[in-house]
Each structure stands twice: as C-alpha cells, then as structure tokens.
C-alpha cells in the first residue's frame, strides 16, 4: 500500500464541526467500528460493550489556561499560546503576530507581567522559548491571567461552560494545552457503572501540546516530523496492564493520547515500562500495536496524523468507510463531537 497525505483527506461539511458539547457528557453518539461492520450507538451504551476484567486507560492531564494576549516592546499586538511550561520561569510557546519577535525582545502579557523571548525552540524551530522578565511563576500566572485554549476550529471564545466541559471529570495533572477529548464523554455516573460491572480503570499522564493541531506540511508521509510530548506511566497502571493481560482481558485506550503513551512504553509481550519519557511516536498504517486492543476516540481532522493513527489501528479502508458513514449520518466531529469505539483490525501489510 502506497499512501500519501492526500489519501487521508475527506469531505466534511462545516456544520458537522461541533461548536458546543452535547447537553450531557454521555449524550454523544458512538460509532462502533469492527472491521467492515459499523453500528450506530449512544455513548451511554459503552458499559454494555465491555466485559468484566477489561481495563480502560485514561489520560488524567488537565488543560491549563495557556492563551495570552499582549503587546510587543515595539508596540505591536501579540497572541501567545503556551506549548509547555518547562519550569516556574521558563516556557515554550507559539506566537501569533504580524512579525515574529526577535530573540532578546520582551512582551507585556495581559497587561500584568513581562516575558523575554530567548530564541527558537522545537525540532523545526516552530516554537519560541520564553522566560519571565520579572519575579513570578508561569503556573500561577497562567491560572490567573490566561485564557482557556479552545481548538482553532471552535469559533467562539471560551465561555463559562467550556471551563467545565473542556476538562475531563478526572483531570488532575495540569500541563496540557488541548484536552484529551475522548475522555470528555465520561461522567461520574458512568465511571461508577463501569466499576460496578468489574471493568477496571487506570491512569497515565500525557500533556497534550498545541502541536496536535499543526497541519502536515509535507506530501510524503515519511517526511513528517512529529511534535514531542511528555508522558508518565505510574507503577499501578503498568501492574494493571500486566494483570489484565494475564487474565485474558482487553486493554482499551481512552483517546489517542493514551494510546500513544502506551505504545511508546510498550514491550513485545503487551506490558509497559514504568516511568516518564518524551514521545514523538508517529503511528501510520502498518504499525504493529503491542499494548492496546481497543480504542475510544473522537473523529479527527482530514489529513491529520491522528487520522493516520486510527487508520493504522482499525484499517485504512475501514476508517474511510466509517468516516463516510459518519458524514452521511450527520455525526458531530472533532473535540466537542461524537465518539468511536474501534476494534484493532489494522494489519502490518497495510504499511505505507
């Protein structure tokens, strides 16, 4: 199979891009994809599709208020999107301005504090390095003066509802600048139902970066360089995966961020390594999955690396058929949209 970036394009009517969440977290639709079989369900049906002894792995990252507006020392307006807080006084960011700021220049953000641009950052130099130019703490300043960073395809500014609904109910480790959106469908009652049915849960942390929205700027998929994100897998989660494997249960990743962390830390026997690391894993058709058996995920952007990931997991032709079905049936797309439950049916022979 020889695929290009254009092979992951699909027509999407703009009105199918969800601008607001469903009235209830579990109120979204769920498209169950098992090979060529497509079944339209409700997300509330999920507990009936799992069995006792299965393990759901969630990403417990919490979205920080990463967007700032301000003024450059030259007087021009600037918008800053934090990519990562490195420590209390240093951060990496994206910059939107009429002209990119130079190293050594300063910016006044939220009319409250000043930062200094120290240079370019990131594998391709797409990000900028910041340091505080006065006493302070980026974590505290973000919480006090920052704005919630909604995705670029959501057209309204962050509202009070977004402060709650663009976080998972189990978010506890601050650091993401985009939500792990598959988890947005779970509410406390569903988590309790899953536990009562003997379906186990475990957590890891992967801080989703703004790079998740970056378009691919290459024609050949092999030429793309993935952004890097940091993840942490605690001992309890690694132990839960080992126990699930030994008992014949399935490991179900809640979201592509959980899947990327698990596969990055995976061993050939389906277990995972404990600890923290950086990952720039780029999963495309032909990838051999080692850890994850099923995947819960939202619908992804055309020509995106995440669409390639789900195509690798469930099969390229199956995903194309599923997305065409979703468009025809008026499913809601992207972060606030509906969900999919994917069975792992991709084959190494699908390699691009």
From Swiss-Prot:
GO BP: any one term: tRNA wobble guanine modification
Sequence intervals crossing the membrane: none
EC number: 2.4.99.17
Keywords: Cytoplasm, Queuosine biosynthesis, S-adenosyl-L-methionine, Transferase
Transferase keyword on record: yes
Main EC class the enzyme belongs to: transferase
Main localization category: cytoplasm
InterPro entries (UniProt xref): QueA (IPR003699), QueA_dom1 (IPR042118), QueA_dom2 (IPR042119), QueA_sf (IPR036100)
Catalysed transformations (reactions): 7-aminomethyl-7-carbaguanosine(34) in tRNA + S-adenosyl-L-methionine = epoxyqueuosine(34) in tRNA + adenine + L-methionine + 2 H(+)
Gene3D superfamilies named among the record's database cross-references: QueA-like
Compartments it resides in: Cytoplasm
S-adenosyl-L-methionine found in the keyword field: yes
Pathway connected to this protein: tRNA modification; tRNA-queuosine biosynthesis
GO molecular function: S-adenosylmethionine:tRNA ribosyltransferase-isomerase activity
One GO cellular component term: cytoplasm
HAMAP family registered for this protein in UniProt: QueA (MF_00113)
NCBIfam families: PRK00147.1, queA
Family label: Belongs to the QueA family.
Quaternary assembly: Monomer.
Chain's role: Transfers and isomerizes the ribose moiety from AdoMet to the 7-aminomethyl group of 7-deazaguanine (preQ1-tRNA) to give epoxyqueuosine (oQ-tRNA).
Protein's name in the database: S-adenosylmethionine:tRNA ribosyltransferase-isomerase
Gene name, Swiss-Prot/TrEMBL: queA
